[in-house]
């Protein structure tokens, strides 16, 4: 009997990079749907515009590098980067926010390091941090959930607000936001931190209208939706469970310990798990195969480090949510983590 001898690498999976990226996008749809339902059409508009900008930038960079743009576009990595950035920014952010962010994500954080598979840091999180530091007002001005708004801002007005700064009645973005919020409102994490710093107790802070049964209204269901999508990715073996498990276990442990030590200053573990970008970060951002750790032990440590950093930044940092900063700081530690968690070679 003759056997066919194939050359290496002897891959055990037939999934290609485009297939993996498609699955990531498909599994993010529940989270996108929840964000659109609770925060209006802005997130969906930002996503469509972001994909168009990301694809254009990817093609332009590949042409400048004298490489085939179609081959690069077929891997769908630019679409996933655009997706992660679009769902991370406030829905009513002006159009130029997404353009500047994607320039940093695609051109600098990705192609400056050599393109797909070569970047040291998560491109979407590099873009998010640059935007957050450079434009803090635009990046922290979230509107209230639609359930708290008497008159929802429709699709046409949302489109006009994003691209012109005014709705069809001539009201500016600031006027519209003041009309639906009463005050400029950030995320529940920001509201909780501000309330604690002003001397309120956690129960007093959580009695505000923006908070629901478990966490912030809308945000708890957005996180649950991303959790469902993440579990599907694990089931389909698109990602492995090590990084999300390390992330969520670490965040839960730290919030549980400090809620016992300082009960008047720390939110409960369930609040941390269902607030901000926790589930998006655990399943869709931290699991980036290029910038994350590569060993089994390393992935657990990598995820646990992110969870600890998220809790530290949320509790004592200058920003309400710390997922982006935590991921980038953990990316810096990947070479060290991989070096000390290398599996022993058989026979040595």
From Swiss-Prot:
The keyword Cell inner membrane applies. It is a multi-pass membrane protein. Its EC number is 7.-.-.-. The chain crosses the membrane at residues 23-43, 44-64, 72-89, 120-140, 214-234, 241-261, 266-286, 300-320, 321-341. Its cofactor is FMN. One of its GO terms (biological process) is electron transport chain. GO terms for cellular component: plasma membrane. It is found in: Cell inner membrane. Its main location: membrane. InterPro entries: NqrB/RnfD, RnfD_bac. It holds the Pfam family NQR2_RnfD_RnfE. The modification FMN phosphoryl threonine is found at residue 187. Signal peptide: none annotated. Keywords: Cell inner membrane, Cell membrane, Electron transport, Flavoprotein, FMN, Membrane, Phosphoprotein, Translocase, Transmembrane, Transmembrane helix, Transport. Part of a membrane-bound complex that couples electron transfer with translocation of ions across the membrane. Belongs to the NqrB/RnfD family. HAMAP family: RsxD_RnfD (MF_00462). The complex is composed of six subunits: RnfA, RnfB, RnfC, RnfD, RnfE and RnfG. This is Ion-translocating oxidoreductase complex subunit D. The lineage of its organism: Bacteria, Pseudomonadati, Pseudomonadota, Gammaproteobacteria, Vibrionales. The gene is rnfD.
């Amino acid at each position: 009997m003759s056997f066919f001898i194939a050359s290496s690498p002897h891959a055990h999976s037939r999934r290609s990079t485009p297939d993996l990226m498609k699955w990531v996008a498909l599994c993010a749809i529940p989270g996108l749907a929840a964000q659109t339902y609770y925060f209006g059409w802005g997130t969906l508009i930002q996503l469509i515009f972001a994909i168009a900008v990301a694809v254009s930038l990817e093609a332009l960079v590949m042409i400048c590098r004298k490489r085939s743009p179609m081959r690069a576009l077929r891997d769908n990595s630019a679409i996933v980067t655009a997706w992660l950035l679009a769902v991370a920014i406030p829905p009513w952010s002006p159009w130029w926010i997404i353009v500047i962010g994607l320039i940093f994500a695609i051109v600098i954080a990705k192609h400056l390091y050599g393109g797909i598979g070569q970047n040291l840091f998560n491109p979407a999180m590099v873009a998010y941090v640059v935007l957050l530091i450079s434009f803090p007002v635009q990046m922290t001005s979230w509107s209230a959930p639609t359930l708290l708004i008497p008159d929802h801002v429709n699709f046409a007005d949302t489109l006009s607000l994003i691209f012109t700064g005014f709705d069809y009645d001539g009201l500016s973005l600031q006027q519209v936001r003041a009309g639906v919020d009463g005050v400029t409102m950030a995320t529940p994490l920001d509201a909780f931190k501000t309330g604690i710093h002003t001397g309120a107790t956690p129960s007093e802070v959580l009695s505000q209208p923006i908070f629901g049964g478990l966490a912030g209204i809308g945000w708890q269901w957005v996180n649950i939706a991303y959790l469902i999508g993440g579990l599907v990715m694990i089931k389909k073996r698109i990602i492995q469970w090590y990084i999300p498990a390390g992330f969520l276990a670490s965040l839960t442990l730290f919030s549980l310990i400090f809620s016992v030590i300082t009960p008047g200053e720390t939110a409960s573990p369930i609040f941390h798990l269902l607030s901000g970008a926790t589930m998006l970060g655990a399943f869709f951002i931290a699991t980036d195969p290029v910038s994350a750790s590569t060993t089994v032990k390393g992935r657990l440590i990598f995820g646990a480090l992110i969870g600890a950093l998220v809790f530290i930044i949320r509790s004592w940092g200058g920003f309400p949510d710390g997922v982006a900063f935590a991921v980038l700081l953990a990316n810096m530690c990947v070479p060290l983590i991989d070096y000390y968690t290398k599996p022993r070679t058989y026979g040595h």
